[in-house]
Amino acid sequence: MISSADSLATRAGLEVLKNGGNAVDAAIATSATMAVVAPHLCGMGGDLFALVHINGEVHSLNAAGRAGSGVNANQMRADGFTKMPMLNNFNSVTVPGCVAGWVSLHERFGTL
């Protein structure tokens, strides 16, 4: 079974299953299609979190973006920050993790 907010993305996932892919392959195809047809709902510029249940075991993936290479926690503290600024500061912008998450899921659990 495949479910998404867009029929094209759902169809993409179903095609992957019909062609021998597993649930992880289908989820990646569905998510990638959503990034094209509905980027306001599921874009490649975001993060990815997954729970995968295989052979009685649950695996988790946190593909949240990391801080940029120029961000230094000690310098931020020295600048007077006591928590991460959420607005109007480049330090709060992360590197997107979605595509790296697809790669990690595919390498570990994909079959196609």
Regions found by a protein language model. Give the residues of each.
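Noncatalytic scaffold domains of N-terminal-nucleophile
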Residues: 1-11, 15, 23-112
